[in-house]
Amino acid sequence: MSRKIARCVFASVALLILSSTGYAAGDANAGKEKANACTSCHGVDGQGSEPNTKIAGMSVGNFKKAMQAYKSGERNHAMMQMFAKKLSDQDVEDLAAYYTAK
């Protein structure tokens, strides 16, 4: 019985490790370095002011969804589409981590 439990624990840990290795989480420090282009419209800390959106404190999911929508053209804003199309997936992850922490 204890061998069966040990195998289950081992399998569970292995699955957790394998499932997390393919995901590149955002790096807030790298995001801070990449955020310079955002400051002219959204402010130094992402607080924004009308008509620009507040991105500080935005959830990672919402930030990523918005950037993808600008990249694909689903959201129509010429300036944001131009910036978003230049961002790699890792750039978006890093920026999301940075602004979520604000």
Task: Locate the predicted segments by residue.
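C-terminal capping alpha-helices of c-type cytochrome domains
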Residues: 66, 70-72, 83-102
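Gly/Gly-Pro-rich "capping" loops immediately C-terminal to redox-active cysteine motifs
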Residues: 28, 46-75, 81
